[in-house]
Amino acid sequence: MSSFCLSKHLILVPILVMMAQLLLIRNVLSLNMNNPYLYHKCSANQGEYKLGSLYKKSLDSGIQQLSKDNEVFRGGFVYMDHTDPNGTLRVYITFQCRGDIYGSHCRSCFATARAELFKRCPRDKAAIIWYDQCFLEFSSISTGGKINYDDNICIDTARARPNAKTHTGDDSVLEFLRLFENLTNIAVTKRNNFVKDVEKPALYAAGEKRFGNKKIYVMVQCTHDLTPRACVECVNHNVRQFQDCYEDKPVGLKKGARVLGRSCNFRFERYPFVNAKTSPNYLKF
């Protein structure tokens, strides 16, 4: 009887191990699907660091300090000016989660971005990487409070269908631009009720609006080191600069697009892509 129980347990152990492995793989795949890698840029302008150098030690120390700061992941943003032990060399680190992402999800995105950025830009003194839920940048030059247009990029997520009867023509583009203007104004005037003891505007807003018989979902966000005025300037510049990103002439508005940037970004799709329940300033127009 005891030998039968023992053999039964021996059979169950590998099955349980296999089930645990499958569950782990499923969770990893789910994370990658919900938070896909978008783009990265290794900056050659600031040169490279050597392994064991003061810059590398300062960078590692700053990243390690950031990873332990729970307030960063509660609030979803940090701009860090970190010096080496001698106080002679500075590293500037910027990290921000999408406006609806907080806590463990924000921390998870940071861990993913950190590992991947060091893999893709192993020796660069300056680099930036974007995921769907966050971005991470480090630099040897101060970037805080300044609008950076150099690292902007458009990602056209879908093409417009020429035979579509809705969402086409100049009227839809103009309506889309008015929607973005309204959303930006909300982002720079309304605070984030999900983050305590922060009185400044959220610099984030999202929402949805019906165009014809379908809906369009939109989001705009600026980094928290910008002033509200600088946020408006950044968004307006990118809307003008990347007109081809969201407009498919002469058809009209594309089905979806996003503009990534160090200082501000915006996105629109024909499907929901943010969590309305955790999004500050989520509106239905």
Swiss-Prot record:
Record flagged with keyword Signal: yes
Stored PROSITE patterns: GNK2 (PS51473)
Family: Belongs to the cysteine-rich repeat secretory protein family.
Annotated compartments: Secreted
Annotated protein name in UniProt: Putative cysteine-rich repeat secretory protein 14
Range of residues in the leader sequence: 1-30
Gene3D superfamilies assigned: Gnk2 domain, C-X8-C-X2-C motif
CDD domains (alphabetical): Gnk2-like
Positions of the Gnk2-homologous domain: 37-143, 161-273
Record carries keyword Signal: yes
Organism: Arabidopsis thaliana (Mouse-ear cress)
